[in-house]
Amino acid sequence: MSRNQLPIRSPSNPAGNREPTYIIIGEVLLFLHNNGTLPDHESIRIIYMEEKITQLPENAHRELKPGEEYQPLLSPKKNYPEVTPWSVVLGIVMTIIFSAAAAYLGLKVGQVFEAAIPIAIIAVGLSSGLKRKNALGENVMIQSIGSCSGAIVAGAIFTLPALFILQDKYPELTVNFTKVFFSSLLGGILGILFLIPFRKYFVKEQHGKYPFPEATATTQVLVSGESGGKGAKTLLISGLIGGLYDFIISTFGVWGETLSTTCFKWGAVVADKAKVLLKVNTGAAVLGLGYIVGLKYAFIICCGSFLVWLVIIPLMNLIWGGQVIDLMNTGITQTIGDMSADQIFKDYARHIGIGGIATAGIVGIVKSFGVIKSALGLAASEFSKKKSGAEAEVIRTQRDISMKIVVVGIVITLAVVFGFFALGVVDNIWHAVVGVLIVGIIAFLFTTVAANAIAIVGSNPVSGMTLMTLILASLVMVAVGLNGTAGMTAALIIGGVVCTALSVAGAFITDLKIGYWIGSTPKKQESWKFLGTLVAAATVGGVMLVLNKTYGFTGEGALVAPQANAMAAVIEPMMNGGSAPWLLYGIGAVIALVLTFFKVPALPFALGMFIPIDLNMPMLIGGAISWYVSTRSNDKELNEARMEKGTLIASGFIAGGALMGVVSAILRFAEVDMFMEPSPWTEPIAIIPYAAIIIYMAIAAIRTKK
């Protein structure tokens, strides 16, 4: 009997007889003939068994040991369904829906929700409901395409509505769909292209060094939805708790969203007289964010907040309380002493944070010079050598778009930006050249800052960096002879392109980290991100024009658009001979340099000075919970199990809160008002439910067994 005719024992043929047999070899199912022989290769029936996804590897969130490699859930040696008609079409649909919702909510209240988590939840739910097999790769692609919505919206609504606001005062200033669409589209494309050379550094080489809070939460949603079991149950329960909790706050207002020391009589007196104030956002989503960020970074961020709110603001009141200080010629008439602590923060102290972020960013750029140099060197080397099989040698999960294509793409995009500026924004070729240089230099350099911020706290300080861009652009444009309404238009379009580039770059690093953990192909994520950017830019442009005609940005009942109003308030005086708050920027710069000298991470500290304290305090509480649950035992494995359980709970809080944020936005859009009348007890009563979810998170994690 020849070797290929030997009877084969298998689960379906334990006796080794000649019955029709299926045998599993690794993960391949082979059909054998009745005589036990293998069929001809043309007729071999190979069926890939459905892979059972359980959870992320143990080393997914920690630094790797020397020689240790991270192995993603999807094997780098295999190909999986990623780009399919299902994933592309659903990704586009998600982009349109969430772009419209985020644009309305952002212009209405100034807050843009992150779409990645809700889209991941929807993708997992649909794939499970339709019983799609091995859908994890598809779901990553759906999330990656769809998440363009929040990034493009943030880039657009922070700057471009300022054009409509100024148009009301200067009728000669023109705004149309083309300006909004192209500034969003070109900025988004630049953000993607500028980030690709840094993907490996942030995603692979810095593995375990950054918490990537939003990427962690989104990945947990995708993996738990695919795996089922205890992880999915924990995520579902915590998601329901966090979602219901945040929905009650945002839709009904049963208790206050913010708990402040002013709810107590002594706190109100101290806030009025000394301008000393502490606030905590009581939302479950922000608490979960703090848990994932961890105690180290949360503490540094809060130190920045404490410096501003407990030292700088009270000192300003003490020293200049009786004076009117108008650093930007914006028409401020109140004395410092007559302002609230919130007003002092908004008009003065926050600019210190902007100066700190800009300086910390520049320091980070200098420190990252080696990374930038290697990225540029890689690009240069691809042009100097002939095409080889090098790309084929790179494993699937580390394969990017060719650096040659990236460089050519950047050059072409900047050329289109030049054409856009020359034909649709300014009348002078020289001004168009200057505009392109500003866009290219600032967007490239601050891409690393945006990615760094997202990796640390999950929050992109894009409005602060954009404000700095607007000021620099205004100074340069005035210096080359462009001012007045033409200068305002040019500076705001430049700011819109840069803002969108930084917003997309920050959001995209989250997508790429998700793909790295799961095992997606970066090249596919990068390629199809451009489609999401195109769809989101078109949607945002159309929605913004409709909202302007429906509500407007000025007058009674107008959309608030707080960031755009701030941009308009800054740029108008500068283009008409005003100035910027250089003293405050300088103070922030000095603080960042001192921190760098003492080896304290300056960027998270500066973020704390810029982000309102009510969003930073719960991060400290969440970070403290993560420290507590991961240090209670002498058993390292038990501590890790507790930490992982807490991460699932925190991810559920974030996911539930994000999803209910979308529901609340829809209700607001439909003008469904179920909000209770505010009363004196709504704020202090928030202590009870907030303490309850803190205790739930800690106890549920502590009870975990190995």
Language model region names:
Residues 2-3, 9-12:
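Low-acidity, Ser/Thr- and Arg-rich intrinsically disordered low-complexity segments
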Residues 6, 20:
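Cationic, low-complexity basic patches in intrinsically disordered or flexible, solvent-exposed regions
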Residues 9, 24-26, 45-48:
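Residues marking helix boundaries in flexible regions
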Residues 44-706:
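Alpha-helical multipass membrane-protein architecture
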